[in-house]
Amino acid sequence: MTTSSNLISSDIEEYLKVHENKDMLRVLTCGSVDDGKSTLIGRLLFDSKMIFEDQMAAIEKDSKRFNTTDDSFDLALLVDGLQSEREQGITIDVAYRYFTTEQRKFIIADTPGHEQYTRNMATGASTCDLAIILIDARHGVQVQTRRHSFICSQLGIKHVIIAINKMDAIDYDQATYQKIKKEYREFAEDLSFSDVRFVPISALKGDNVVNESPNMTWYPGSTLLKLLNTVSVEQDRSESFRFQVQYVNRPNLDFRGFCGTIGSGEIRVGDTVATLPSNKESRVKSIVTFDGELEKAVAGQAVTLTLEDEIDISRGDMLVRPHDKPFSVSHFEADVVWMTEEPLCVDREYAIKVGSKSVYGYADAINHKVDVNTLEKQSAQQLALNEIGNCHFAVTEPVQFDAYDTNRSTGSFIIIDRLTNVTVGAGMIRNPIEVKSTKAHEYSEFEIEMNALVRKHFPHWGAKDISKG
């Protein structure tokens, strides 16, 4: 493998130091079936000189074995790792690939295009900053293009590059490119993207992927890789300090630290913080890491914080700025992606996990589900596998969160089946719900005892605990 940096051959330690300090961009690729997502990632890796010689030899061998292309080798096989993917020529699982340029590091998630793998795509999109949505130049904007764009919008991705692929198949026709560009812009007006860019490419031939295309001199913009290198996503990240405690570290009587990853914002030694839900305040005494103590820590860093005062803090509690607190309520509105065969039912109790805080809760109403192909809102009594819906949730105790649109790290949650411990859904919190206090229904002693027996002997019914109101 060759690299664009000469440091790797002359000074490996300096190369690693420079590499560590590069900005990280998480990228999602999605589009209709056979639009060329895996081939595009393979082309990025190949033209960036990020492929080992033994990998190339293996790909040439597999290309002949699976007959996936008429060329000597199929770049898509760099990404399609599952046996069933290679045999069918499609992507099923979310495949992650890593590469670096002089400007930044990349993690690329190659997600499946088929509707039955919507949950896989949602999983890949949940951590990405930017999406590359591929459109086949021969077919234009398809139903799956709309579905993937909607899911990206729902999951908070603000930056989108529309890569109009297979331009070689239409003789690099500018009019077709402009027509597709206009059609997508009209469709995307209702979505929450803040930055949409277009680039005509041929992943198979390499046009406008890493190198400029001599076949499309009419295109004045940048190549795909240049767009990836220059897009700025810093302004999308919340500046509010959020630190959720994952573990209380007490190795001896003289040390009590609170371990976790900073979700957003930054913290310095001496800063005043408030603990939630107790609302007690203290100051940061030290910021401890494996490599030693720090004066300052920022979003994404895993650290241990110690405080000047002895405050009762447990796993799931949150440290924030006293003047900048999140919502803390037990009822909220959320969009949910359902991920299992057994549907989401109203009033069935689940384990709800917001960050490291675990509570029990249920959907007390499904406001609507969304047809991901037409974006039409439909009434629903339940959510089936791969469906997306808007629900009202009630949990047993207040949880601390920000709206997902403003802070993805604290505005997301997962839904867990209490019996199997399987993650059955993923949610994005949109708004808190203020519940007007009303006189609680008075249950008889017999009803409470019967409810307790049902929950004990028939837990799979998912009955609520009526003794808690």
Swiss-Prot record:
GO terms for biological process: hydrogen sulfide biosynthetic process; sulfate assimilation. It is an enzyme of class 2 (transferase). SUPFAM superfamilies: EF-Tu/eEF-1alpha/eIF2-gamma C-terminal domain, P-loop containing nucleoside triphosphate hydrolases, Translation proteins. Residues 202-204 are annotated as: G5. Keywords: ATP-binding, GTP-binding, Nucleotide-binding, Nucleotidyltransferase, Transferase. Residues 89-93 are annotated as: G2. GO terms for molecular function: ATP binding; GTP binding; GTPase activity; guanosine tetraphosphate binding; sulfate adenylyltransferase (ATP) activity. Residues 165-168 are annotated as: G4. This is Sulfate adenylyltransferase subunit 1. The lineage of its organism: Bacteria, Pseudomonadati, Pseudomonadota, Gammaproteobacteria, Alteromonadales.
